[in-house]
């Protein structure tokens, strides 16, 4: 009896007439009268919702359509490879998406399949090949041992030093003459040039050390004035705090318009629970986008427009 594992995409199996015709076509090619099929959906096998028995099937059928994704192909090809017997074939039927044609061939090879045909695809699991042990000879040939012995017999003597006394004295004189040609680097620079370099490179004694933020009281390098100018500019650019008294009222409408209050999160109209800590609408009740809201809190009525939301 021939056992067949069938994997089909849900869309392919939904067309019952097409699915039955494809199964009958592949069954007609089988020479075995008795036939057993196990049918599974691709998405369930790829999602590990169902499993396949290892080495349990004589052949495999794979029905794909354009809805099949590359992730599903990567997941099912190794599982089909393990489910069929060594030497079994996997026939593929259906229409591929254009970008999956080359990907299917690559993933088939990575899963271990051999590609027998590409139109349509027919894959085959390679048959198992038993390993044959090889006996390695440990005997040494006579020529090899003789060669080793001859190598020691005809070893070349080491080269000895044959320099005469005259050559040694001549080399010593040349070395002394070469030392006389060296120059003292300190002699190349005068004392005035050395003192000038120290004055240029040394920082002023009254200046602060690098990285120190606080300047000296008697700073003469201009850093103190520069820091004061930067601090004054920063304080001028900072918004001034509004001071309120018991008899003073503030118009929220003018404040919101002067600051160009614009909602960046889009949730300001929902109320304080949905507003960030820096929201210009903090303290105001919820309102509808674009709606004019009037509030009375025992003082003059305040109004504003939420057109910027």
From Swiss-Prot:
The C-terminal domain binds 2 Fe-S clusters but is otherwise mostly in an intrinsically disordered conformation. The N-terminal domain has structural similarity with S-adenosyl-L-methionine-dependent methyltransferases, but does not bind S-adenosyl-L-methionine. It is required for correct assembly of the 2 Fe-S clusters. [2Fe-2S] cluster binds at residues 207, 216, 219, 221. Residues 265-279 are annotated as: Fe-S binding site B. It is found in: Cytoplasm; Mitochondrion intermembrane space. A motif (Cx2C motif 1) lies at residues 265-268. Pfam families: CIAPIN1 (PF05093), DRE2_N (PF16803). Monomer. Interacts with TAH18. Interacts with MIA40. [4Fe-4S] cluster binds at residues 265, 268, 276, 279. Component of the cytosolic iron-sulfur (Fe-S) protein assembly (CIA) machinery required for the maturation of extramitochondrial Fe-S proteins. Part of an electron transfer chain functioning in an early step of cytosolic Fe-S biogenesis, facilitating the de novo assembly of a [4Fe-4S] cluster on the scaffold complex CFD1-NBP35. Electrons are transferred to DRE2 from NADPH via the FAD- and FMN-containing protein TAH18. Belongs to the anamorsin family. This is Fe-S cluster assembly protein dre2. Disulfide bonds: none annotated. Residues 1-132 are annotated as: N-terminal SAM-like domain. One of its GO terms (molecular function) is metal ion binding. Residues 133-195 are annotated as: Linker. Its cofactor is [2Fe-2S] cluster; [4Fe-4S] cluster.
């Amino acid at each position: 009896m021939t056992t067949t594992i069938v994997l089909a995409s849900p869309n392919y199996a939904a067309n019952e007439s097409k699915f039955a015709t494809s199964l009958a076509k592949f069954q007609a090619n089988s020479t075995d009268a008795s036939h057993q099929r196990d049918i599974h959906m691709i998405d369930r096998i790829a999602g590990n919702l169902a499993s396949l028995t290892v080495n349990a099937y004589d052949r495999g059928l794979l029905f794909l359509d354009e809805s099949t994704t590359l992730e599903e192909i990567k997941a099912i090809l190794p599982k089909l490879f393990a489910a069929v017997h060594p030497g079994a074939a996997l026939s593929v039927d259906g229409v591929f998406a254009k970008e999956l044609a080359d990907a299917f061939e690559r993933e088939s090879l990575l899963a271990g399949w051999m590609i027998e045909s590409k139109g349509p695809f027919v894959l085959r699991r390679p048959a198992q090949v038993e390993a044959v042990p090889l006996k390695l000879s440990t005997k040494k040939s006579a020529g090899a041992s003789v060669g080793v012995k001859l190598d020691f017999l005809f070893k070349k003597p080491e080269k000895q030093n044959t320099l005469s006394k005259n050559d040694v004295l001549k080399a010593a004189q040349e070395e002394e003459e070469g030392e006389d040609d060296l120059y003292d680097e300190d002699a190349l620079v005068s004392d005035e040039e050395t003192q000038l370099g120290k004055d240029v490179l040394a920082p002023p004694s009254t200046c602060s050390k690098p990285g120190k933020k606080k300047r000296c009281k008697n700073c003469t390098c201009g850093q103190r004035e520069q820091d004061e100018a930067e601090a004054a500019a920063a304080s001028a650019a900072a918004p001034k705090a509004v001071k309120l008294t018991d008899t003073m009222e503030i118009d929220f409408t003018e404040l919101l318009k002067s600051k160009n209050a614009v909602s960046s999160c889009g949730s300001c109209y929902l109320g304080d629970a949905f507003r960030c800590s820096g929201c210009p609408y903090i303290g105001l009740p919820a309102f509808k986008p674009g709606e004019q809201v009037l509030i009375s809190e025992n003082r003059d009525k305040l109004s504003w427009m939420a057109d910027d939301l």
